[in-house]
A protein has these predicted regions:
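Conserved structural position within tetratricopeptide repeats
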Residues: 51-52, 82-86, 120
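Canonical tetratricopeptide repeat
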Residues: 63, 97, 131-135
Length: 142
């Protein structure tokens, strides 16, 4: 049906928008599908190629870092989050995920600093701030 066709055409854009991007290309869209399937190794490979082709895309670096972190490469992930935030210091996804990394590696003050910045960027709250707040509280309870 035409409805299904339209959905299939726009679904990569909906997935990409979930990660803060409104104009994904094929590599980026493929990486997001891998991430949603928790296939982080495949996502990392695609995002490595993507960031080579689009080195100024903060969101590409963010998802590359996220995939690296999910695979246990915490030091590399930290460098990649820094790269993403150097390109766009207001990248909410990068601030959230970097904050999670800080909390995960026992640096609660840095995690709280990222949360404070997110609260400034979204005074009426946003998913990134709520997710980071929840993650920090979850770590603190352990």
């Amino acid at each position: 049906s035409i409805t299904l066709l339209i959905f299939l055409l726009i679904s990569p854009y909906l997935l990409a928008a979930k990660y803060g991007k409104t104009d994904p290309d094929k590599l980026y869209s493929r990486a997001i599908k891998f991430i949603d399937q928790e296939r982080f190794f495949e996502a990392k490979k695609v995002l490595k190629a993507y960031t080579k082709s689009k080195p100024e895309d903060s969101y590409g670096w963010t998802l590359y870092a996220f995939s690296e972190r999910k695979l246990g490469g915490l030091e590399k992930a930290e460098q990649l989050y820094e790269k993403a935030l150097t390109l766009d210091s207001n990248n909410k996804a990068a601030l959230e995920y970097q904050g999670e990394l800080f909390a995960q590696t026992n640096r609660p003050l840095l995690a709280e600093s990222n949360l404070a910045k997110l609260k400034i960027l979204c005074p009426d709250s946003c998913e990134e701030a709520e997710q980071l707040d929840s993650f920090i509280k979850g770590i603190a309870e352990k």
